[in-house]
Amino acid sequence: MRTLRVKKPGGLDHLQLDDANAAEPGPGEIRVRWRASSLNYHDLLVANGGLSVADGRIPMSDGAGEVDALGAGVSRWAVGDQVMSLFFPNWQEGRHRPEHTRAVTGDSIDGCACEYAVISENAVTRMPKGLSFAEAATLPCAGLTAWQALMVRGQMQAGDSLLVQGSGGVSVVALQIAKAAGVSVIATTSSSEKGERLKELGADHVINYAEDQNWSDTVNKISGGGVDHVIDIGGGATLKDSINAARTSGHISLVGILGGVSAKIVVPMIFSKQLEIHGVAVGNAAMQDDMTRAFEASQIKPVIDRDFDLAETAEAFALQTSAQHFGKITLSI
């Protein structure tokens, strides 16, 4: 079977595609034939050496495929079932505890950049009906991050308002989830072309932050005093503006650090506006099942910019690094 590995010391030129034998599942395990994966910033850090992983680690946290074989005692799955990976396979339900996130797919344990994988029967959830493998593969990290931020932490409801930043995977799927829920969305981008695509997906207002350095003030004017929810992907570069753009008693979900890991913020504004600021890192299996049902009911179709073959993973990461993509980049396995 084709298997992609990250070889020491890391770097896109140290991604190695080799051939390995498919193992047989043991008790409580299943074998999955992965059909597709998708790229996340976390995967880039694993691939380029930004995160230290074991030599020969199989990368990629996102995967969609079908159950190929069952180990003894497995009853929740049947051969042929279509499934998605879990970013944190040990976090099944409830509030996060440290032990839930010690196993990270494609990081501390092997990921989905291989044709076959033997994993715990609890390491996958059901794929949404009506989606292709590539579309489903965009959801376990970016989709679930947006879902937890908006629907679990934010308790988003019809009539609310949302600010999304940029046009990457989390922001685009957050826009789609919000529009399906009857929410008004303001999106920011530095590209007029991407701005038009955001409008096509339902964004009610688009602000070009390259042309409007006071974009958070503009959000306040458009929304009449701030938005109910903010998806912040910029971290250090955008948190101050996110705080300014949120309404009183609003929710800010910190989901990325694309603009830096440190931020200077106006602390009094946080408590004077009584804001709730959440750090959101993907989610658990129960949340992923809820997201799946919502995607089936709303018939949301994830946005894929371009699909690459597994052998072209380095080229896929190069596109991701260029920031020229819109939505998700996927791999066919």
Describe every region a protein language model picked out.
Residues 22-37, 47-92, 108, 128-130:
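Glycine-rich beta-strand-centered segment in the early N-terminal region that forms part
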Residues 224, 299-303, 315-333:
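C-terminal capping/lid region of NAD(P)-dependent oxidoreductase domains
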Residues 161-164, 179-241:
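Adenosine-nucleotide cofactor-binding segment
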Residues 100-101, 181, 198-199, 233-306, ...:
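Glycine-rich phosphate-binding loop and adjacent beta-alpha segment
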Residues 171-172:
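N-terminal Rossmann-fold NAD(P) dinucleotide-binding loop
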Residues 87-165:
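NAD(P)H dinucleotide-binding glycine-rich loop of Rossmann-like/cofactor-binding domains
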